[in-house]
Amino acid sequence: MTLKIRSAVKKDFKDVLGLNRSMYAEFHSNPNFGDFVFLKQSSRQRMLKWFNTLLQDVRKDNALYYVAELDGKVVGHCFVRRESPGSELSHVGVFSILVGKDHRKMGVGKKLLDHAIKESRGRFEILHLRVFKQNKIAKALYKSRGFRSFGVAPKFIKRKNSYIDREYMYLLL
């Protein structure tokens, strides 16, 4: 079993859709998972539009998009999207990552993050991300790669009847 990190392509959509849909199921069993979720799961059509727009942003040099592939199946993905192309924020990349539940704690997230950081150098000057304040595992990974916290938005997300604080982190490239 060899893990391969590569650029995302159109044929990855089915696996990416499966990963994103499994994320919705996980929110019910793990209230501290993720950053936020839409109240209603996105349709296949809406997800395809998001996916194609992200691939277009890659072609325009406004995003990087990678998948982690294990035995021919996408088990995780991450992207860095330019904060605001053509503006005074175009040097900032917004990082996002998702690793399938069955492939966590196997180094997939580390490899995706390391690859994204490496490829971001020279394209962006700053990476930033958001994470649930109580997500100690994700925050430890980000801190181990040099990310620093720059603030917390209390009660930023309301999930069912409870609130979750959102933490913001950045990395100077």
Task: Give the ranges of each region predicted by the language model.
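Conserved acetyl-CoA-binding loop-helix of GNAT-fold acetyltransferases
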Residues: 96-99, 105-119, 139-144
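A short gly/proline-enriched turn/hairpin at secondary-structure junctions
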Residues: 27-41
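Acetyl-CoA-dependent GNAT
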Residues: 21-24, 39-102, 113, 172-173
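Terminal substrate-recognition subdomain of acyl/acetyltransferases
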Residues: 163-173
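Short glycine/proline-centered loop/turn elements that form peptide/ligand docking sites
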Residues: 109, 113, 134-138, 155-160
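Conserved GNAT acetyl-CoA-binding A-motif
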Residues: 120-130
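A short beta-loop-alpha structural element at the N-terminal edge
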Residues: 4-18
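Conserved catalytic-core motifs of GNAT/GCN5-like acyltransferases
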Residues: 82, 128-132, 143, 148-165
